[in-house]
Amino acid sequence: VFFSSVASSAEAWKKDDTITSNIVCLSEETILEVARQDTISFENASSFVQALLQQGRCVSFMRPTEFQVDKVLLTYKDHLKRETFILRINYIFSDNNPFGFTIALQRPTI
C-alpha cells in the first residue's frame, strides 16, 4: 500500500522533497503498524487503513495534497518486495511543524 506519489527522479526520498498524498497518519506508531501490514499483503494493509480512517488515527483528503518531506523515518520492502519509505511530512509553508506520516514507494522515474 502506498499513500503518496510525485513525478521526477529515481532517487530515494530526502528532506525538503515535495510529495503529494491523499492519506496521512497522525502518529509514528500508527504508520509503523500500517507498514507491518503492508509487508504481509495489500488486502491486510488496505483494510487496516480503512479502520484507522474510521478511528481518526489517519486522515484522507478529497484529492492529493502537497506536503514537504521533513524526515525519512525508515525504508522497508512491501509485500511485492518494492522499496518503500515511511516519511514524516509537513505542510509546504510550515515552520518545522510535522503534520503527520505517509508511505511512499521509491521516487518514480519520468
Q: What is the role of each PLM region?
A:
Residues 1-5:
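Bacterial N-terminal signal peptides
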Residues 7-8, 49-52, 67-71, 83-85:
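Short amphipathic alpha-helical surface micro-motifs
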Residues 9-52, 61-63, 108-110:
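SH3-family beta-barrel domains
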Residues 11-27, 77, 84-110:
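Boundary regions of SH3-family modules and the immediately adjacent low-complexity/disordered segments
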Residues 55-73:
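Conserved beta-strand/loop element in small beta-rich adapter and peptidoglycan-binding domains
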Residues 72-80:
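Surface-exposed patches in mature extracellular/periplasmic domains of secreted proteins
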